[in-house]
């Protein structure tokens, strides 16, 4: 009986750990530190442990890039870029519901709110959108604007272009 209970517990824990991995329902941007719970410099193994193995791979991207979404072919989620085997960039895909930054800054906020609440003071113009950026010691945090509203978040190595 005791062996059976131990074996059942071990099996339950083994199957529970992978089930816990996945894209967060309400991911958070921690400026200069993390996006969706993933930090710059993490290994692919650490990303898989946190987000699971349900991701697509970008075939035309200059860096190895994984797209984590909530359902197959869904546009909403998180992109994770790798350089030399480490996370070098993270950005939201479209506007995943519930994702936010500090001060309750969410998608749809005005550029003025982004400037005021984040201190992002530099504007980088990309092809069809803009990014308000703020550099910290080791990272660049990006607040993407489209059509005059906050559209997404990004986190990159310091000085990296936020344009994708």
Mark where each language-model region is.
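Bacterial N-terminal signal peptides that target proteins for export
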Residues: 1-6
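Sec/Tat signal peptide C-region and signal peptidase I cleavage site
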Residues: 17-21
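N-terminal periplasmic "start-of-domain" segments of outer-membrane beta-barrel proteins
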Residues: 26-29
